């Protein structure tokens, strides 16, 4: 019975297998390199058969694929087995959800930097990333039925970081960070796209109310009385005119130039115009500054209007536009 392989040796073999089957697949190799590749493939296959129990799943795949199984994501090299890489930093676990079932603020492919990576495993992995109002999810592709990882954006911030790479994507990198929490680092396809992701993340940490969380005034909140009066104070020009029709008095009003004894008793009812006033409606009296108006009724005083007569014409008069003619 063959001794069990140490875990780090199994990891190395898996990385080497992935490197040969995936990374070298698209390379143009010399005849000597191809021969060496075939030797390595044979030796790896022999080792896996010698430890069939430990590599049972991989062995089954070898038989089906004539050698080595191709990874589901060409950029994600031997990453799916590393469960620790995908676990949330705080130990929280979030319900599995399909990528297509999420309502998101932004979604798209990014390159995610691995927390730990080996010599053969790629440092950057292609991931379908989804930012919601409060969560960040990442998947192998936009068709995945469950996320590879997720974390709450509560407390997190985002910023550009041009020190993560030294290649053409140097200015396309950004990171999501928070005090005492894991830092997540990504690379977009362009600096503009990276900045858009940063802005979306910065605005998705619960600071923006959703459509169902619009801000409304509290109907139970007590309103300061003085403030309420300021809001609803009626100005003369905005005062509501009475809707009740005015009945023309049967008695003839005392004319202005009347010198009879009645004038001496009606001084209090004589007013003069403070400003020019043009009636907007037929039942409103028009007058100019200084015109004499005889007030017939103050029935609509609460509305800011009186009933007056001038030169035989009767109509509504805004009381704020007239003043007493005599100081009695």
Curated annotation (Swiss-Prot):
The keyword GTP-binding does not apply. It comes from Xenopus tropicalis. Phosphorylated on tyrosines. Residues 103-206 form the PH domain. One of its GO terms (cellular component) is cytoplasm. Residues 238-248 have a biased composition (Basic and acidic residues). CDD domains: PH_Skap-hom_Skap2, SH3_SKAP2. One of its GO terms (biological process) is B cell activation. Its main location: cytoplasm. Residues 231-262 are annotated as: Disordered. Belongs to the SKAP family. This is Src kinase-associated phosphoprotein 2. InterPro entries: PH-like_dom_sf, PH_domain, SH3-like_dom_sf, SH3_domain, SKAP_fam. Gene3D superfamilies: 6.10.250.220, Pleckstrin-homology domain (PH domain)/Phosphotyrosine-binding domain (PTB), SH3 Domains. Keywords: B-cell activation, Cytoplasm, Phosphoprotein, SH3 domain. May be involved in B-cell and macrophage adhesion processes. May play a role in src signaling pathway. The keyword Phosphoprotein applies. PANTHER family: SRC KINASE-ASSOCIATED PHOSPHOPROTEIN 2, SRC-ASSOCIATED ADAPTOR PROTEIN. Residues 266-327 form the SH3 domain.
